Amino acid sequence: MVICPIRAISVIRGYTFGCGGAALGNPRLNVKENAQRSTSNVQHRMKRPVHLDEEQVREHLRMEELIPAMEKALIDFSAGKVTQPVRSVITIDPPGGFFGMMPARTPEGLGIKLVTFYPPNAKLGIPTHMATIFLVDPETGAPLAVMDGRLITEMRTAAVSAAATKLLASSDSKILAILGSGVQARSHVEALRLVRQFEEICVWSPTKAHAERFAEEIGAKAMSVEQAVRGADVVVTATSSRTPVLQGAWLKAGCHVNAVGACRPDWRELDDKAMGNVVYVDSREAAMKESGDVILSGRKIYAELGEVLAGKAPPRGNETTIFKSLGMAVEDIAAALLVYRAATKKSGR
C-alpha cells in the first residue's frame, strides 16, 4: 500500500497516473470527451426552433381563446408588466408604406414582430400587410419559433376590438357597421359576433363592388357610408384611408366605435366631431406618437383599455365611445405564444 501525504501525479506517454500508479486516462481525450458531452447537453436543452407558415398558424389559433388572451395582455401592459418600446418604423416611399419593428418582453414571453405595409399590394392581389414573428426563450435567449405573423396581426387586432366592444358597447347592441372590406373587416365580423348578438350588419367600402361582394359573403347589406353608420350600435373603421371617412354627426348617441386604420401621425379615419367623444387607446404613448386621429384632433385620451379592464378607470359605456387601436407587440407575442404552445403540444415536443 502506498501512502501519499501529498497527492502525486505523473504523466507518462500522455497518460496520467495518480497515487498508487492508477492510470487516470489521457487528459487530451478527457477534454475532448467532456466538450462533446457538453455540446450534446446544450443541444438537448436547445431544441430546434419551430417554423410555422400561415396555414399552420391558422390551425392552432382560435378567436375564442385569443380574446381573453388579448384582455390579459392589455391589462399587463397598462399595469407596467411589459417592456415594450413604441414601434420603430422605416418609411418606404415609394410605395408609401413602411417597415416596422415591434419587440416586447412580457410576463410570459420574449420576441419581436417585423411587419411591412405596402398599400399598392391591394392592386396586385397580395396582402398589404405582411409580418413575421420571432419568439425566444426568456431564460436563455434561445430561439423558440419563427412564424408567419400576417394572420396573427389580423386576428389579434379583431380580438382586441372584441374586448373593447364587450367592455364599452351596449349589451343589447343589434346593428353593426363595418367600413372596409378587407381582411380586417372580415376578421372583425368573426370576433365581434362572439361578444354581441347582432341582428343586422351594414357594410361600406370605397369600392362599391368590394362592398357588395363582402356583404354577400357575410349576409350583410352594402350601402353608403352614412347609411351604414346612422343607427349602428357598433361601428368598425378598417380602411386604408388617410383622410376621415367617418363623421361624428352620423353617430348614434351611446354607440361604440373601433377605429383600427390610420396608424401614422398624419393619417385619419375619424373627423374631429367623432373624436370629440370618450377616447380609449391601447397605449397612450403610442397614440401620441402614431395616431393621426388623436394627434390632429387634439383630443384628450380618457384611458387605456387595459386600465378599464383592470377596473382602474370606469368604462363610461353609456356614452359614445371611441377605441383607437394601433396594435402592440405585447398582443403579437401573446398570440404567438398561443400558437407555439398548441403546435408543440400537438407534436409532442
Q: What is the role of each PLM region?
A:
Residues 181-182:
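Glycine-rich Rossmann-fold phosphate-binding loop(s) that bind the pyrophosphate
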Residues 1-46:
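Intrinsic disorder/low-complexity segments
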